[in-house]
A protein has these predicted regions:
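Domain-level signal for soluble alpha/beta catalytic cores
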Residues: 1-391
Length: 391
């Protein structure tokens, strides 16, 4: 791939930002059938203009639209296709679903319940068909109002495959290999359209890779008759096939352990939950050396991620974006704390191969989230740290 200056950015964020209250209110009315598409679109446009201007004023050299056109980051694919076997009237799912509210605890929803595609595990009623390119729509508007490059996030094949009920869809797809091959073809078309429109930085969201170090997730795969090692290799192959042949475009891949969070009833503060546990050690050598993406955006905000030792396995042509700042904790990191952790990481990977970001996005439409003020304080701390470490 030809070099792109965005390959070496020292600062990043993962995509989603805290939705303004007014936008969340319009989203809720739209889901209940009480607001039109036009009203929702106008509210989204207004909020996106504002959040892009704020990112620029806070010193970010790359911006996103905050994912303000999505309920969840996973809609970057599910809203683009038809063919999944989903129940009718799922608009209110986000208001009604039952989530674990216990602080500082593993928290997973019931993936087998009737809900939206990919948010829950759905089969296919027919082969998927592309009906729109939501990331392209997002990029065109974001870049039209931005003074700096706009970054777009797209859900990767691994998560899509993990949330596909293949065993109930064998009359449509021959199995996971057939399904994933089709997903790659669909997403390559979406990416090609983004690149043609001028997008220079595309982030693949791949939270499912940490399933391959998490015992609960591995047991779940095996219970479905799947071979985790085969799934792992298929996903790497698919992620690489997705991005080949787009010179001059920066591709990042984001890996995390889930972005669940809740409110501590004792303190009233936002505190973490999580979906998976396990360090990168067991997958690092294969994953870091086989993926072709220029930027590896890695969650590193808690002990669940393990130490920095696996970074010694990162090839010399990649940047590791350290996700050191928590998006699911009201506690504020300090510049000194972040500099200390970057220094620790640099013992295993040279400082010129490191960058800094939050550990994940700041949350979807139904998430318990930081306040906007808390989010900007955290983003400002990242900017200040980057300026001190890399000048």
């Amino acid at each position: 791939m030809a070099a792109n200056p965005l390959d070496n950015l020292r600062i990043d964020h993962i995509g989603s930002l805290v939705r303004p209250a007014q936008l969340k209110e319009v989203f809720a009315r739209f889901d209940r059938g009480q607001a039109s598409k036009e009203e929702l679109s106008q509210a989204q446009d207004q909020a996106i203009r504002g959040v892009i201007a704020q990112q620029e004023s806070h010193g970010y050299p790359i911006v996103t639209d905050g994912e303000f056109r999505r309920h969840s980051f996973q809609e970057s694919f599910s809203e683009c296709v038809t063919g999944f076997d989903v129940p009718k009237n799922i608009g209110l799912y986000y208001e009604k679903r039952d989530l674990n509210e216990t602080p500082l605890e593993r928290a997973e929803q019931n993936f087998e319940e009737a809900g939206p595609a990919i948010i829950t595990r759905r089969g296919a009623a027919e082969r998927l068909k592309v009906v729109r390119n939501l990331p392209l729509e997002e990029y065109r508007y974001a870049q039209s109002v931005a003074k700096v490059p706009a970054k777009i996030t797209i859900l990767g094949p691994d998560r899509i495959a993990q949330r596909f009920k293949w065993e109930a869809s064998l009359n449509v797809y021959q199995g996971l290999d057939d399904f994933v091959e089709h997903i790659v073809a669909i997403e390559r078309q979406m990416i090609a359209e983004l690149v043609k429109a001028g997008c220079k930085y595309i982030q693949i969201d791949a939270p499912g890779y940490t399933a391959y170090v998490d015992k609960v997730s591995l047991d779940r795969m095996r219970s479905r008759g799947e071979d985790p090692e085969r799934n792992f290799q298929r996903s790497i192959d698919a992620d690489n096939a997705l991005i080949v042949g787009f010179p001059g475009v920066t591709f990042g891949i984001h890996i995390c352990r889930g972005n669940a969070r809740t409110i501590d009833p004792q303190t009233g503060k936002l505190v973490p939950q999580w979906h998976r546990e396990g360090s990168y050690d067991a997958i690092a050598e294969k994953l870091f050396n086989t993926l072709k993406h220029q930027r590896l955006l890695l969650e590193y905000d808690s002990d669940r991620a393990g130490g920095f030792e696996p970074l010694r396995l990162v090839p010399k042509d990649k940047i590791v974006v350290l996700g050191l700042v928590s998006t699911k904790n009201s506690d504020m990191e300090t510049v000194d704390d972040l500099k200390r952790r970057i220094d620790q990481a640099s013992k295993y990977l040279p400082i010129d191969q490191l960058a800094l970001s939050p550990q994940c996005g700041f949350g979807g439409i139904d998430s318990k989230v930081l306040s906007e003020a808390e989010m900007w304080r955290k983003l400002d701390t990242i900017v200040e740290t980057v300026n001190q470490v890399w000048n």
